[in-house]
A protein has these predicted regions:
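Pseudouridine synthases involved in rRNA/tRNA modification
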Residues: 1-30, 83, 216, 229, ...
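RNA pseudouridine synthases
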Residues: 1-195, 209, 338-351
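Short histidine-centered loop motifs in beta-beta connectors
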Residues: 50, 213, 219-227
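Short coil-to-beta-strand transition motifs
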Residues: 76-80, 201-210, 316-317
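Short Gly/Pro-enriched turn/cap motifs at secondary-structure boundaries
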Residues: 135-136, 201-204, 310-314
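Short beta-strand segments enriched for Tyr within beta-sheet-rich domains
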Residues: 157, 232-240
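Active-site lining segments that contact anionic ligands and/or coordinate catalytic metals
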Residues: 209, 221-223, 233-235, 317-319
Length: 353
């Protein structure tokens, strides 16, 4: 891979290191890798001559960087899993990820991941490279996700995310009616003590900001568009739980809200097994009081899962859109991932209720 920069009048006596970092977006770690390399496939050159990074350029000098990314994917087993490719070129690949799919192999999920599927897709083209996730999604969150095909692209897009020029938008269904057309949730998030996975709101947490906008209101739920100013783990899900509008179908960050009681009461839903188990009478369930005030957390959780499963089998959260500047082509890319069928079905049910 080659990157080129032609020095202008303002660059007189400027170091190559400054140009590589600020104009070509090469990270310090990549600079260290390139510093002492020279040859046909890798190195730093000015006017076709190898130079060190402290070399000072003159107007008209042509700075050329050759990078040879010799990293294969031997640690990821290719698997023939169907993927929905939204965009692909020699530098990156963008996928509409299915729900119930892990992005990258981890201890408990060594196979069946999106990385396994992409590795297979590339292997069919005779390409053996390590794919690098630029964005990440929870296992049960669907939608657009970006992978880089080399470390330079990964770093360049990560820089865009850091300076907030990389746009990510999500669509989610939350329980209850949100009255404000738009708003911002600004609550710090940190890992919950004694938990590897769970996050919670805490004064000692990292700053976390989620913006939301109402797309449509239903009798018991609201369809929202989210944009993030920060990128904490489970941020949207934790923030929605905190404002008493949990993401529909989310059994990790669940919260009982009165909209669920109304849903149960209006459609006379009955849960005989749980009623018998917890000695709760049917009248108690449907006398226009919240089950939260009458039942144990275990009972509530069972009912919560049952009601949510009638609408959707996972959290109703979808990564809808990304927009960023292509690091090589220098053109803006906007990529949209259509909603998956299970979220469409949930919205149809809400529309008809």
């Amino acid at each position: 891979m080659e990157l080129k920069y032609v020095a202008n009048e303002k660059d007189n006596e400027r170091t190559v290191k400054s140009i590589l970092k600020n104009e070509l977006g090469i990270s310090l770690s990549m600079l260290k890798r390139l510093k002492h390399e020279s040859g046909p496939d890798s190195g730093i050159y000015v006017n076709s001559q190898p130079v060190y990074v402290n070399y000072k350029v003159k107007p008209g000098d042509v700075v050329l960087v050759r990078m040879n990314f010799d990293d294969n994917c031997d640690d990821i087993v290719p698997e023939n899993i169907k993927i929905d490719i939204l965009y692909e070129d020699e530098y990156l690949i963008v996928i509409n990820k299915a729900a119930n799919m892990v992005v990258h192999p981890v201890a408990m999920h060594q196979s069946g991941t999106l990385a396994n599927a992409i590795t297979y897709h590339l292997a069919q083209k005779g390409i053996n490279i390590k794919v690098r996730p630029v964005t990440r999604l929870d296992k049960d969150t669907s939608g657009v996700i970006v992978f880089a095909k080399n470390p330079y692209i990964q770093n360049a897009l990560s820089v865009q995310m850091s300076n907030k020029s990389f746009l990510k938008e999500y669509i989610g269904i939350v329980w209850g009616t949100i009255n404000e057309d738009r708003g911002t949730i600004n609550l710090p998030i940190e890992r919950k003590p004694n938990s590897i996975m769970l996050r919670h709101i805490s004064e000692t947490g990292k700053p976390s900001i989620t913006n939301y906008e109402v797309i449509k209101r239903y009798e018991y739920a609201t369809l929202l568009k989210f944009s993030l100013e920060t990128g904490r783990t489970h941020q949207i899900r934790v923030h929605c739980q905190a404002i008493n509008h949990p993401i529909m179908g989310d059994t990790l960050y669940w919260k009982w809200v009165y909209a669920i009681d109304l849903f149960i009461q209006k459609y006379s839903l009955c849960f005989p097994d749980e009623i018998e188990r917890y000695k709760i009478t049917e009248k108690q369930c449907y006398e226009n009081q919240s089950l939260e005030n009458q039942c144990s957390d275990e009972y509530l959780f069972n009912i919560y899962k049952h009601v949510n499963s009638m609408l959707i089998q996972r959290q109703a959260l979808h990564s809808y859109k990304v927009r960023f500047l292509h690091p090589i082509k220098k053109s803006e890319l906007e990529i949209i991932a259509p909603l998956h069928d299970d979220m469409k079905k949930a919205l149809e049910i809400l529309e008809n209720k």
